[in-house]
Amino acid sequence: MPITINNFNYSDPVDNKNILYLDTHLNTLANEPEKAFRITGNIWVIPDRFSRNSNPNLNKPPRVTSPKSGYYDPNYLSTDSDKDTFLKEIIKLFKRINSREIGEELIYRLSTDIPFPGNNNTPINTFDFDVDFNSVDVKTRQGNNWVKTGSINPSVIITGPRENIIDPETSTFKLTNNTFAAQEGFGALSIISISPRFMLTYSNATNDVGEGRFSKSEFCMDPILILMHELNHAMHNLYGIAIPNDQTISSVTSNIFYSQYNVKLEYAEIYAFGGPTIDLIPKSARKYFEEKALDYYRSIAKRLNSITTANPSSFNKYIGEYKQKLIRKYRFVVESSGEVTVNRNKFVELYNELTQIFTEFNYAKIYNVQNRKIYLSNVYTPVTANILDDNVYDIQNGFNIPKSNLNVLFMGQNLSRNPALRKVNPENMLYLFTKFCHKAIDGRSLYNKTLDCRELLVKNTDLPFIGDISDVKTDIFLRKDINEETEVIYYPDNVSVDQVILSKNTSEHGQLDLLYPSIDSESEILPGENQVFYDNRTQNVDYLNSYYYLESQKLSDNVEDFTFTRSIEEALDNSAKVYTYFPTLANKVNAGVQGGLFLMWANDVVEDFTTNILRKDTLDKISDVSAIIPYIGPALNISNSVRRGNFTEAFAVTGVTILLEAFPEFTIPALGAFVIYSKVQERNEIIKTIDNCLEQRIKRWKDSYEWMMGTWLSRIITQFNNISYQMYDSLNYQAGAIKAKIDLEYKKYSGSDKENIKSQVENLKNSLDVKISEAMNNINKFIRECSVTYLFKNMLPKVIDELNEFDRNTKAKLINLIDSHNIILVGEVDKLKAKVNNSFQNTIPFNIFSYTNNSLLKDIINEYFNNINDSKILSLQNRKNTLVDTSGYNAEVSEEGDVQLNPIFPFDFKLGSSGEDRGKVIVTQNENIVYNSMYESFSISFWIRINKWVSNLPGYTIIDSVKNNSGWSIGIISNFLVFTLKQNEDSEQSINFSYDISNNAPGYNKWFFVTVTNNMMGNMKIYINGKLIDTIKVKELTGINFSKTITFEINKIPDTGLITSDSDNINMWIRDFYIFAKELDGKDINILFNSLQYTNVVKDYWGNDLRYNKEYYMVNIDYLNRYMYANSRQIVFNTRRNNNDFNEGYKIIIKRIRGNTNDTRVRGGDILYFDMTINNKAYNLFMKNETMYADNHSTEDIYAIGLREQTKDINDNIIFQIQPMNNTYYYASQIFKSNFNGENISGICSIGTYRFRLGGDWYRHNYLVPTVKQGNYASLLESTSTHWGFVPVSE
């Protein structure tokens, strides 16, 4: 049966079943038993603060108690009202967890499964129901005293947070011999200390995705992920597979490195998080933990076979029932003999589920929320929110609520987009700092006098995590004895969520028939912990490092005015100065508004900044790093690069190691030798020893690669990622200063247009965030390429060199073994030597995907080798009404005749076949491209729109790159778009797409996306809108000489078509024309197709941007043969007289409610209304009040759309919201009924056949009528009857 989550008020009375007073004996803040509420099954909540400290104190401590950030509030959960809120927040989170199958399964296991009643001190034949890690006392007040009346055996108790409110923790019980039942198979109760309304915030600045496209890239965690992460720990504890806390990766503590101080990354945390971070734990260690758990489970099974008694003896009657519960929990097998055993396959299945499926990383995907992609992410100031308010946080969507338009790009979690997310009081925060001390030399002094220390405090969390080399396991490199009995352990592959959890029927759980025995004896009271304090550390530096440079870019608080400076020292010493690394920006900002031209000045400043941050320097397109971001050096002074002069030149000389503040040199530990021997001098055993050695040799190579990967992930990538985070902060500091300067100048501005330009000024400032997102994509690409280059060029060769030396020694030993036993091996010597020689002939290849199942890492590596953009050798774009090549190869582009360039999106260019429209574009590619080798595999893609076409028109070439009858071309012949490869006049091959030339209006004039891929040794393929249309084999085209000139021109192909006159002018529009020096695959093409659609902007029927204040014919996708008309004031759709013509019916104009009047594009989520003019009278479309009638019956919640005379009053009846609904086959939108504030989506616009009222009479026959379906309209969301198209009247 489904899981039921109980509802409570904190004031509800104790009922001795679901509400009890519990005494855990663990909370040192509790002077008496605490009120507890059963959420479901074995899961309980105590809405009180929790501490294990011997002397607990909830006040902000005088010194830091953790390397992590801390938030303290002694008043939190101090009142019954606070406790009631906390209780209801936990209940709501459990309901949200329970809304997905994986969450339901998680709750089910925690609420029904039980720890083993006992531990390794318990006699093997006994169930002990009174163990201290399992039993919690139930107490009742009798007079002035609390009396124990029983006990319960929960699996999880959730309490309020510990002293540090933002540091959730899951704890369990330690046994007297310093072992944990939670780690030894038995399982144990977990106490989770958490605060659901305080959330950590992170940056997704290192991700090349669109989340930051319209705002800053900072987001808060969904509170269910915080809770579910801790529930993962609780489940590991419950199943007895918890990883010991001493299994960690520590941060480097040396003053040589800028690394987080005293941070220990626990393996247990990595397991609970999952995802890419799991690769920080070597597979050998993961296998060790799994095998250890298997041994413990075998011990548990052995105990179950021996159980004969229970403590207390009154529970002997429950022995059989508890055995069955434990057999089910551990997935043990009961043999025909009755013996309980462990089936290894069932154990592996269970272990994989617990460690690879139930992870924070997977939860984020399944609940569709934004989350950190790796465990080690940049942390920002925490936020709080009222998650009990369904308008802020609901069970289905969390913060990303569709009705508030916060579901797009996870805006509900975005700190700059959701006002409900409030930063906590900074006065209550506490940080561990590193104090940098820079002692400069006074060059003016004759004796080079050292100046006083220039101090800078940097938060510990702002430093990168650099793993200590001593924690990267090296035991795999120890000397190893090889004989005929040596075994090789192979590590299992990762498993997927789909394979395990989501295939289960989690709704059929059965009744929660849990036992809660009453026990009279007292549990042991365990001692509390002592509070540990940390001291800030001081680190001397010999130059102003990146942290000083970032500090110099921050705008000081309460500064009335400021100027930009190029001197970091000046900015550090003067609060009215801000350092910038863009000289022209400094000049323009500091000049201020000249001659009252405020808007021109602001535009110039923003354009200068955005131009600078989008700069890339290309040294060599064939190199590993495709483009350098030149301003990273002066922005962060990485490795004192500013002192070295030009950063790009320094990078070219030094390479990627210039970016690493620490650990620029990589060394592999000494590889222990193989000691080869055979105990018995027998032929088969010697041969087996040789085989085992060859297998161990392969394992040694793979182990070395794995060690290298662990080192790269924990010590190198973290440093590279830190540069991305720092650059994100730097760009935002620069943009923040620009915004502040614009505000200051606007405040002083007194022009008559001040109010009119206010919205333009705001749009200018907002555009800075958009450009920062674009710049971060460039920076992240550069950083990723550098990190991968370091792996392949700095690390991998050294590992292979060491392994080759190891191979030479091992091979010599094996040959010696064969020679020294040549008599025993008679007849086999030459064969064995050949086997050894062949085995050592080649190195073991490094396939990175053999060492990780990390999809994010795979994407990075694939980008390194096969990045789509990197393979562009031509990118023809319209930039500021000029056609240019933006690929980096700088092809020459010229225009002849009348080529019309569109100055607004989609920035296309138009070609015509005759008259004034005739023109051509000529592209001459760079001489440095070696065409014949480049085009062994190549692809071409472009968007094209062609006006109406008929089959008897002549054929036309539209794009031509043929010279001396050799090359390629694209044309239109009859109803086909044709791509042709031509070797000579007699040898060519073509592939085509049948273009719709039907007589129906829908069959022409639309934008569509064409991709042709060519593999000269394989196939030619054509894709339309990302879909594969046709594949043909490339045959006998081995000598194509490709031209460097590409001409875009409509030229008639002789002897084609029936019409020979030039009077029928053909027009077409082209945009985003690319050539790639590779064969794109289907995934590449889909990425390209989706990235070029700009899906947030609503499209008209042809695929152009839908515009405000422009006339359109409105059509329904299900009834394209109908046009919009009015019968009295009721809108109806009549049958067209000519299916080939959209120009029939009434025209509508889309009007905006509010927003930027300079941007005429209609965007998804816009609130708008529709104007219509009929016989010179103005109307609005509006929703009528009467419901529709069908078959003489009222149709519930369906209302007609009619006409209302236009007035100045804009009321809710005429207001709608629009969302794009584009797909492979057409461009359309969905229209929803909304209100003036856009806060309420009450219905969806559809179409259907109804009768409607006119005056007091009903029409006798039915009409096709547009309607609004209110109430439950979810079923219509997928219906094409709700898809509306807008055909421009002018086209």
Swiss-Prot record:
<dbReference type="InterPro" id="IPR036248">
    <property type="entry name" value="Clostridium_toxin_transloc"/>
</dbReference>
<dbReference type="GO" id="GO:0008320">
    <property type="term" value="F:protein transmembrane transporter activity"/>
</dbReference>
<feature type="binding site">
    <location>
        <position position="229"/>
    </location>
    <ligand>
        <name>Zn(2+)</name>
    </ligand>
</feature>
<feature type="region of interest" description="Belt">
    <location>
        <begin position="490"/>
        <end position="541"/>
    </location>
</feature>
<feature type="binding site">
    <location>
        <position position="269"/>
    </location>
    <ligand>
        <name>Zn(2+)</name>
    </ligand>
</feature>
<dbReference type="GO" id="GO:0045955">
    <property type="term" value="P:negative regulation of calcium ion-dependent exocytosis"/>
</dbReference>
<keyword id="KW-0843">Virulence</keyword>
<dbReference type="InterPro" id="IPR000395">
    <property type="entry name" value="Bot/tetX_LC"/>
</dbReference>
<feature type="disulfide bond" description="Interchain (between light and heavy chains)">
    <location>
        <begin position="437"/>
        <end position="453"/>
    </location>
</feature>
<protein>
    <recommendedName>
        <fullName>Botulinum neurotoxin type C</fullName>
        <ecNumber>3.4.24.69</ecNumber>
    </recommendedName>
</protein>
<dbReference type="GO" id="GO:0090729">
    <property type="term" value="F:toxin activity"/>
</dbReference>
<feature type="active site">
    <location>
        <position position="230"/>
    </location>
</feature>
<feature type="binding site" description="Sia-1 binding site">
    <location>
        <begin position="1126"/>
        <end position="1129"/>
    </location>
    <ligand>
        <name>a ganglioside GD1b (d18:1(4E))</name>
    </ligand>
</feature>
<comment type="subunit">
    <text>Heterodimer; disulfide-linked heterodimer of a light chain (LC) and a heavy chain (HC). The LC has the proteolytic/pharmacological activity. The N- and C-terminal of the HC mediate channel formation and toxin binding, respectively. Can also be purified in complex with a non-toxic component that is larger than the HC. The stoichiometry of the whole complex has been modeled as one BoNT/C, one NTNHA, three HA-70, six HA-33 and three HA-17.</text>
</comment>
<feature type="short sequence motif" description="Host ganglioside-binding motif">
    <location>
        <begin position="1256"/>
        <end position="1258"/>
    </location>
</feature>
<keyword id="KW-0964">Secreted</keyword>
<dbReference type="InterPro" id="IPR013104">
    <property type="entry name" value="Toxin_rcpt-bd_C"/>
</dbReference>
<feature type="binding site" description="GBP2 binding site">
    <location>
        <position position="1281"/>
    </location>
    <ligand>
        <name>a ganglioside GD1a (d18:1(4E))</name>
    </ligand>
</feature>
<keyword id="KW-0378">Hydrolase</keyword>
<dbReference type="Pfam" id="PF07952">
    <property type="entry name" value="Toxin_trans"/>
</dbReference>
<keyword id="KW-0582">Pharmaceutical</keyword>
<dbReference type="GO" id="GO:0008270">
    <property type="term" value="F:zinc ion binding"/>
</dbReference>
<keyword id="KW-0800">Toxin</keyword>
<feature type="binding site">
    <location>
        <position position="233"/>
    </location>
    <ligand>
        <name>Zn(2+)</name>
    </ligand>
</feature>
<dbReference type="InterPro" id="IPR013320">
    <property type="entry name" value="ConA-like_dom_sf"/>
</dbReference>
<keyword id="KW-1015">Disulfide bond</keyword>
<feature type="region of interest" description="C-terminus of receptor binding domain (C-RBD)">
    <location>
        <begin position="1094"/>
        <end position="1291"/>
    </location>
</feature>
<dbReference type="GO" id="GO:0004222">
    <property type="term" value="F:metalloendopeptidase activity"/>
</dbReference>
<keyword id="KW-0645">Protease</keyword>
<dbReference type="GO" id="GO:0005576">
    <property type="term" value="C:extracellular region"/>
</dbReference>
<dbReference type="Pfam" id="PF07951">
    <property type="entry name" value="Toxin_R_bind_C"/>
</dbReference>
<dbReference type="Pfam" id="PF01742">
    <property type="entry name" value="Peptidase_M27"/>
</dbReference>
<feature type="region of interest" description="Ganglioside-binding loop">
    <location>
        <begin position="1269"/>
        <end position="1283"/>
    </location>
</feature>
<dbReference type="GO" id="GO:0033619">
    <property type="term" value="P:membrane protein proteolysis"/>
</dbReference>
<dbReference type="GO" id="GO:0035594">
    <property type="term" value="F:ganglioside binding"/>
</dbReference>
<dbReference type="InterPro" id="IPR012928">
    <property type="entry name" value="Toxin_rcpt-bd_N"/>
</dbReference>
<comment type="similarity">
    <text>Belongs to the peptidase M27 family.</text>
</comment>
<dbReference type="InterPro" id="IPR011065">
    <property type="entry name" value="Kunitz_inhibitor_STI-like_sf"/>
</dbReference>
<keyword id="KW-0479">Metal-binding</keyword>
<feature type="binding site" description="GBP2 binding site">
    <location>
        <position position="1119"/>
    </location>
    <ligand>
        <name>a ganglioside GD1a (d18:1(4E))</name>
    </ligand>
</feature>
<feature type="region of interest" description="Translocation domain (TD)">
    <location>
        <begin position="450"/>
        <end position="865"/>
    </location>
</feature>
<keyword id="KW-0528">Neurotoxin</keyword>
